[in-house]
Amino acid sequence: MDRLKLELPRKRYISSRTAREIRERLIELVLLLAATSSIATMIAIIFTLVSESVAFFQEVSILEFLTSTQWTPLFAEAHYGILPLVSGTLVTTAVALAVAIPLGTMAAIYLSEFVTPQIREIIKPCLEMLAGIPTVVYGYFAFLFVTPLLQKILPNLPGFNMLSAGLVMGIMILPFISSISEDAMRAVPVGLREGSYAMGATKWQTAWRVVYPAAISGIFSAYILGISRAVGVTMVAAIAAGLEPKLTWNPTESAATITAYIVQVSLGDLPHGSLEYQTIFAAGLTLVLLTLGFNIAGHFLSKRYREIY
């Protein structure tokens, strides 16, 4: 009888332990499936882009694709030079970064170093709300408000132009840069700030000469995320910058970006498997490689200037 009483708790313990191990294994399996699904999705996207692009480059020379200054794949006299789309993408991105990087950095410094916690809890959510506005709303805001405003300053500015598109794209990516940069600055140890104050530095000097350099790795990551976001913006560029593929580096002119062209062609009724249809995937692969290049550069810079505390 006594032995039976001792065996019962032991069996309950073993049963409980087995059930806990099963739950842990199930959780691990779910997490593994989640991680695997994201990797599988990326592999599927790359496979689709590459397979269709290979078929495209069997008909079009890679040299022509990379060096030709005309992009007219839907015309009777077709040209397949990606440079006009790349230039439009880079110009709008450069204008966006010229707005978002200084404003986002200053906003991050203010939220991290100067504002009180109560005011931060009001300002930061309002700033992050900009990231939740649909891009089509930004596009029409650029076309119907920003462009007419700029035309009062620049009378010869056309209705479609990369300047207004880039300015609004800068506002759109501002929350990404400011929020991540602020998180990086707030992660800087308090001891660095106190040491700076002890040396007689002002709050601004501490923020700019101590905190900002110490957080530069995370801030670079914010900049790269902003670049990747700007490069991939579709509706703002399609609505405000126009759909005319043109090799120009002048932001006051109209042009087409890679994403805008993809939208333009995908809304048509091109036959599946045609050369014109395959230009979508060649342009998409170019966009992926462009974004990948920015991400690799950002990773290198972040690693190069990373501080370990």
Give residue ranges: language-model regions.
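Cytoplasmic-entry segments and transmembrane alpha-helices of multi-pass inner-membrane transporters
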Residues: 103-142, 180, 308-309
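Periplasmic/extracellular loop-to-transmembrane helix junction in inner-membrane transport proteins
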Residues: 12-30, 50-96, 116-117, 264-277
